[in-house]
Amino acid sequence: MKFVDEANIRVEAGDGGSGCVSFRREKYVPDGGPDGGDGGDGGSVYLQANENLNTLIDYRFTRFHMAERGTNGRGRDCTGHGGSDLVLQVPVGTRAIDQETEESLGDLTVNGQKLLVAKGGFHGLGNTRFKSSTNRAPRQKTLGTPGEVRSIKLELLLLADVGLLGMPNAGKSTFIRSVSRATPKVADYPFTTLVPNLGVVNPRPGQSFVIADIPGLIEGAAEGAGLGIRFLKHLERCRMLLHIIDIEPIDGVDPVYSARAIVGELEKYSPKLAAKPRWLVFNKTDLLLDEEIQAKIDRIVKELDWQGDVYTMSAYNRTGTEELSIKMLDYIRSLPAIVEEITADADVEFKWDNYHSAEDENANENYDDDFDEDFDDDDYDVEVIYQR
């Protein structure tokens, strides 16, 4: 199945049903009073995380989604039926962004988690609601409020513990194949990897972590060179980064220059992402003699002024990959557990929150005197006796 990590959709919540103006009319009860029911609430639109999905491809072809409208109220105090909510299934790790305000509506990081993206309209009030001692036969009602309409951008961010960084042909896909059962395409030309890949690494029985491989970066990616930086978003949730450097590039480019270019593109995209823990890993050591390897590493580390962790491996021969996997596992397990921050709901005033109270006050202040003069409140409990 094609991997799609972005989609634009339009969601429309259902409108609220309108209230009803009706009066009780039965045999022997000519002035029964108001009995118009309220309308039903409009259906809302939700996003729900589903662990069985791994792509947003369905939303590339179906872009418009609408919840059900609430039905209108009826006589005899019949309330309208509320509209059914619309629940859209998305992969775990999906982020919803309002395209008009560029506001992040929320992230779905747990299976089954739901996110409200468009609230349904509130129901209208029937004329029974406006009954009072001075307005005993009201002919007022309110309309249901319209449901929210939003244009939303869906972004799928992969959930992984370790993210791989590096130039094209640095050996990232070969590394993920050597330490996991993932099978990304490997070839001797740049940009073999066109979409992100995930692999589960099991260095010890019962202990594992997830590693993410993204397409390679080149200088100028922030301006759109190569495949651009659109795939860097998949590293935002990684707990550490593995910067893989080709120690003996076939094109003769200095590894120092390549490493600085990667860091520069990372900082342009997100300083927060650039500040994540990062290890340097020199790959393709099988192409050099042992004495050449250390000399070259010392020179690169010195020119980069690197103070962090440094490792060597040959992903093709699987030399050093197992030891590196164990060290990554130990480091990840030493990090504090991720705790989901639960923030208090913001006190947001929706446009319909005070709508009905205002309409009620306005109706009672400016009511029409057009009502039945002989109306009797006791008619609600009247006992009807049928005689021949």
From Swiss-Prot:
| Biological source species | Shewanella frigidimarina (strain NCIMB 400)
Where in this chain does the record put each OBG-type G domain?
A: 160-333
Top enzyme class, one word, equals hydrolase
In this chain the Obg domain maps to 1-159
Q: Which Pfam families match?
A: GTP1_OBG, MMR_HSR1
Q: Name one GO biological process term.
A: ribosome biogenesis
Give the GO cellular component terms, alphabetically.
cytoplasm
Query: Where would you say this protein principally sits, based on its record?
Result: cytoplasm
Protein family per UniProt: Belongs to the TRAFAC class OBG-HflX-like GTPase superfamily. OBG GTPase family.
Gene3D superfamilies (alphabetical): GTP1/OBG domain, P-loop containing nucleotide triphosphate hydrolases
List its EC numbers: 3.6.5.-
Is-annotated flag, keyword Iron? no
Keywords, in A-Z order: Cytoplasm, GTP-binding, Hydrolase, Magnesium, Metal-binding, Nucleotide-binding
Which residues are listed for Mg(2+) binding in this entry? 173, 193
Which molecular function terms from Gene Ontology are attached?
GTP binding; GTPase activity; magnesium ion binding
Protein name, as recorded: GTPase Obg
